[in-house]
Design a protein with these regions (language model features):
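A sequence-composition feature that detects small, non-aromatic residues
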Residues: 6, 25, 41, 88, ...
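Active-site beta-strand/loop architecture of penicillin-binding DD-peptidases
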Residues: 114-155
Length: 177
């Protein structure tokens, strides 16, 4: 891990953090291992995946008609942020914190984007929505469960964290810092 850090081949992503896991930031300076998914209109089902559907909001319970159709209408609402995570972000950086607002949104925030619980429906979550890994219509031109957004399997931020933990456990405080 220390060799990877010393290599100078990678650095932390310096773009909009909310885009780090979207198609907008494919092959960025922080990406170490990434799947190459290519949009091919003649073979769009080649990019079929449950990943986006599982991680996207529970769209069958939402009215997204006011969102200018920027979000994909297919999602099952797994991996929903909980209030405990939201509160930890707020404690660290406040309700206007950059990382908080680039990582997740409250129900009030997505309502301002035109996404609301549909009439007669209810959501089983604590009112927080993943934002860093949202599923847009742009990355899914074929619709439904297909996306050409690359998967990031290893990011440099993870290497830095793992190296700090390993160095600390090994008693090497200067490398851990």
């Amino acid at each position: 891990l220390n060799e990877v850090r010393a290599s100078g081949k990678y650095k932390l992503y310096d773009g909009n953090y909310e885009d780090i896991l979207t198609y907008k930031a494919e092959y960025n300076c922080e990406s170490m291992l990434e799947s190459n998914r290519i949009f091919d209109a003649s073979n769009s089902m080649d990019e079929f995946s449950f990943f986006e559907v599982m991680n996207h909001w529970r769209t069958d319970k939402l009215d997204m008609s006011g969102s200018n159709n920027q979000f994909n209408g297919t999602g099952w609402g797994f991996m929903v942020p909980q209030k405990k995570l939201y509160d930890a972000f707020v404690q660290e950086e406040g309700v206007d914190g950059y990382r908080l607002n680039q990582t997740m949104k409250t129900y009030d925030q997505i309502s301002q984007l035109g996404v609301k619980v549909a009439k007669g429906q209810s959501l089983i979550n604590e009112g927080y929505f993943m934002w860093k890994r949202r599923f847009s219509n742009v990355e899914s031109p074929a619709g439904f469960w297909c996306s050409y957004n690359n998967y990031r399997w290893m990011r440099y931020a993870e290497v830095l964290l793992l190296a700090a933990e390993a160095n600390l456990k090994d008693g090497n405080q200067s490398e851990a810092d």
